[in-house]
From Swiss-Prot:
The lineage of its organism: Eukaryota, Viridiplantae, Streptophyta, Embryophyta, Tracheophyta. GO terms for molecular function: farnesylcysteine lyase activity; prenylcysteine oxidase activity. It is found in: Lysosome. This is Farnesylcysteine lyase. Its cofactor is FAD. Glycans are attached at N56, N113, N211, N281. Its EC number is 1.8.3.6. Plants with decreased levels of farnesylcysteine lyase exhibit delayed germination and hypersensitivity to abscisic acid. Involved in the degradation of prenylcysteine. Cleaves specifically the thioether bond of S-farnesyl-L-cysteine and has no activity with S-geranylgeranyl-L-cysteine. Also recognizes N-acetyl-farnesylcysteine and may have a role in deprenylation of farnesylated proteins. Keywords: FAD, Flavoprotein, Glycoprotein, Lysosome, Oxidoreductase, Signal. It comes from Arabidopsis thaliana. It catalyses: S-(2E,6E)-farnesyl-L-cysteine + O2 + H2O = (2E,6E)-farnesal + L-cysteine + H2O2. It holds the Pfam family NAD_binding_8. Its main location: other.
């Protein structure tokens, strides 16, 4: 959901239990020579990544001929990666931005020759305002002139303005983000040095990220000696935009949110959902669209999946790659996972013209292109941003709210509306500290849960990282007589693989 162009890249320099080795012992497995059937529930980046890595990592194992069935309850693939069309233009409505060090999704884009979309000049040069409900407590200058020298001067002025307001806390925040990113990069190390994890806690402890889930972002930033002013203003704006929540989210989710607001951000031209579509198409998957799985039952040595279409499927391995928090799937035997709520973000796209009077301004040019807000229940929106300018009186905007945006609110915010599109997303978990995690393995057999990792952080890349681990976990546990050979491990060593 993180799509708002945030022109604050100038602030950032950048943004253990070892359980099962790649050649580890296996449990359960194939008892005959027939190909195994792997069923994946959910076609988002998590589920499609599992399919992709299963195909790439099981070349010389008994799973290399596995049949992969994928079930998607909607009519298109992509999960929470969706686009919306407003007045003929396509915009990201779900998972929207990618970090320059999101190496799995970068590999997907390069592998399938997808086109990278970089921020437009208006996005990179947009002025930012922080609204407290009555006035702008922070307001930077926009650039984007035809003269690069003038743009540089404006950037320096904004630098100085923010430094005078927040001081050395800006540098401490940059260091906090960089340390988190460096730890996350351990998930791309060679497979020889990177274990397979059967629980989220072990995965986070190994990378040095677990302690960030034990305290809130506010507490972690206080430990890092950031000023309360910076936390209550700029950091709050970022967490409200990227996760729809306050600085009381867990420290790890907050750090990921901050990293998603720096420079070098990008997306896929035409929609990020294309990554999932390409992964599925190139992984020899039998795709069942518009088919909702309503029950998953373990029957002696296999799973039976039943759908709302009345169909039944026999599966040796089942992977749940959709949040179980708002999906009604009956499990037999029952499973036990911690209760978790999803944070709903209401996204509204409006083509029209913002009302400067709402912000106490006489001219629209006085209103920043991105308006973020402080944590105040009386403020009815999290942020408003210009997505596209057609003319001085005709633009497309994107608004995030925690509650549905009523017509009366939109009529206050806009002087004119020609088109309005509303979307309600169960976007990501409601983060707390300390976090409690569901297991990757939901039973004693082969029922796996990709979205257990979402309680650490929810992004397209973290879903791909979790999907890769699940694929390795399936291979290591499923095989009774075989394990990944040395040659296989060498072919996997980069974590980013070429099709065979």
């Amino acid at each position: 959901m993180k799509d708002f162009p945030i022109a604050i890249s100038l602030l950032f320099a950048l943004l253990s239990p070892v359980l099962l080795p790649c050649s580890g012992d296996s449990t359960g497995g194939v008892e005959d020579d027939s190909p195994a059937t792997v069923c994946i529930v959910g076609s988002g980046i998590g589920g499609s990544s599992v399919a992709h890595f299963l195909r790439n990592y099981s070349v010389s194992t008994g799973l290399n001929q596995a049949k992969i069935l994928m079930f998607e309850r909607h009519e298109i693939v992509g999960g929470r990666m969706r686009t919306v069309t407003v007045a003929g233009d396509t915009f990201e409505a779900g998972g929207s931005i990618l970090h320059p060090k999101n190496y799995h999704v970068k590999d997907f884009v390069e592998r399938f020759n997808l086109t990278v979309r970089l921020p437009t000049p208006i996005e990179e040069s947009s002025a930012i305002g922080i609204w407290d409900g009555k006035r702008f407590v922070v307001k930077t200058f926009g650039s984007g002139t035809k003269f690069p020298f003038l743009d540089t001067i404006v950037s320096w002025v904004n630098d100085l303005y923010l430094f005078l307001r927040y001081g050395l806390s800006l540098l401490r925040m940059s260091s906090f983000i960089e340390n988190t990113v460096d730890n996350f990069l351990k998930y791309y190390e060679s497979l020889e040095s990177r274990p397979i994890f059967d629980n989220v806690e072990g995965m986070l402890k190994w990378s040095g990220l677990y302690n960030l889930t034990k305290l809130t972002l506010q507490e972690k930033l206080s430990e890092a000696q950031l000023s309360p002013l910076l936390v209550n203003e700029l950091v709050t704006v970022i967490t409200r935009i990227n996760y729809g929540q306050s600085v009381l989210i867990s420290g790890l989710a907050g750090a990921v949110s901050l990293a998603g607001s720096g420079g070098g951000l990008w997306s896929v031209e035409g929609g990020n959902w294309q990554m999932a579509a390409k992964l599925i198409n190139h992984s020899d998957v039998t795709l069942h669209l518009n088919e909702k799985i309503e029950s998953i039952s373990y029957l002696e040595n296999h799973y039976e999946l039943k759908s709302t279409k009345g169909n039944s499927y026999k599966c040796d391995v089942t992977v749940v790659a959709t949040p179980l928090d708002e999906v009604d799937i009956q499990f037999s035997p029952t499973i036990s996972i911690p209760k978790r709520e999803l944070q709903h973000t209401h996204t509204t796209f409006v083509r029209g013209l913002l009302n400067p009077g709402y912000f106490g301004m006489k001219s629209l040019s006085d209103v920043p292109a991105l308006v973020g807000t402080l944590e105040d229940p009386l403020i009815p929106f999290s942020c408003i941003s210009i997505l596209r300018k057609y003319s001085k009186t005709d633009m497309t905007y994107k608004i995030f709210t925690r509650q549905p945006a009523s017509d009366s609110l939109l009529d206050e915010l806009f002087s004119r509306r020609t088109e309005t599109v509303r979307i309600d997303w169960g976007a990501y978990p409601k983060y707390h500290a300390p976090e409690v995690f569901a297991p990757f393995i939901l039973d004693d057999h082969h029922l796996y849960y990709v979205n257990a990792f979402e309680n650490a952080a929810s992004t397209m890349e973290t879903s791909a990282v979790a999907g890769e681990n699940i694929a390795r976990l399936i291979i290591s546990r499923f095989m009774t007589k075989e394990s990944l050979s040395s040659s296989d491990k060498r072919s996997c060593s980069s974590g980013l693989h070429s099709d065979s």
